[in-house]
């Protein structure tokens, strides 16, 4: 932003540089880490709090069909994972990390607070659904603000964490572990608090709490910017503040284009088919270029690494498209077919993933180190295979639990077990994903490969919406009885379980062969990393 910032008007001097010994510390780490921890915790609080309610809000308040709601959700998640590529590039080349985070946080506040204006609920009269056009468009516009806000904030705040430490600082990994704990803490609390408020007191209260959380994050980052010691300053402040057209500086034009991007996202959310076509074209061009480059410019070892990486990205798309059912089909299944008791609500069950991560991530970290020291640690392809099998087993557990039901209502323990299996799968795959890209990429197209990796997450989000739409349960004046809706879910859950388990087992069989092609790039364990979503 244009306001005054520490060291924003010049490059940090040697004494100010983030890589030097920080003047103030907290628990042995730079004091700026606390600012970033709290900012990201509240940002994730707002994101996951809204996410826990969104599919229920679409189907219950706006009375949108399951299929339509799932496609909107999938489009939203897809764009959320695609936009950080552009947000990161803009920050690196022009804005600087600090300004990008501030701009993203402001957009997020606008989006989350916009979600709190729920308007009158939709009604059914004579078989026709009537809903407020104004509040429907407010919904889409609010989601668009959140999408672009995440794009500017999410990739850049993580980068600032890295710049608080010298490259060889032994505290660096520990600092990132603390930072990622903030992500999971925010997600855990949000899916409990926002979901409970939204489903019991009214949607506006749940979404409003998410917005208040983002406001807290914005305030903390703004007030604590002095503790960042110049980390995240623009690469060229003079160029950024040069007037280029219409009397506006380059910085102001970037903000204006960010608002234009909000309008583009607003339209894509209402036209999921066009978004799918755009993703398909862009993905085909990107992957085609990478393959062409590997054939023309790479030696045999480099080409093999690139092709293995592209293959593992395909399995990543499969895993995350099934994992993302948590926000759509699994939440609707929970609402309609799970025995929840008097305390828990459907959205609150999403908290089990974040809770299990906080409990199990340290154990997995120790496990990988223990296995690595004995030469038993699974290779990257094997970890991807184990993750895929586990996400399939999670759905298989639900099918088994459903078959024990006599009235269409499933005991909550089966759903909790599914979340446990999905989380252990996530712990096998997520920490090694980015590491794989950095290790296997040819230096000449390393940035391109990182972009393709993020694009694969966008594909997974969109595919997840398509999968959830296949489980659309007819709704209207007379919704299906639990036993009837259960049969719809069980049929698709069974197919998903079979596909994932077969695919995972096939990859596990192939993993020794794949490892030979990537052996020159393999490095020691990734145990120090944590899942980042």
Please tell me what each predicted stretch does.
Residues 1-28, 167, 195-331, 335-341, ...:
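Intracellular loop-helix junctions on the cytosolic face of multi-pass helical membrane proteins
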Residues 52-72, 326-349:
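Short amphipathic helix-loop junctions that connect adjacent transmembrane helices
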Residues 74-92, 109, 154, 188, ...:
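Central cavity-lining transmembrane alpha-helices of secondary-active solute carriers
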Residues 79-80, 171-191, 198-199, 206-217, ...:
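Glycine-rich segments within core transmembrane alpha-helices of 12-TM secondary carriers
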Residues 80-82, 223, 281-293, 343-374, ...:
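Transmembrane alpha-helices of Major Facilitator/SLC transporters
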Residues 93-109, 302, 370-389:
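Cytoplasmic membrane-interface "Motif A"-like loop-to-helix N-cap segments
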Residues 104-134, 385-407:
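C-terminal ends and interior cores of transmembrane alpha-helices
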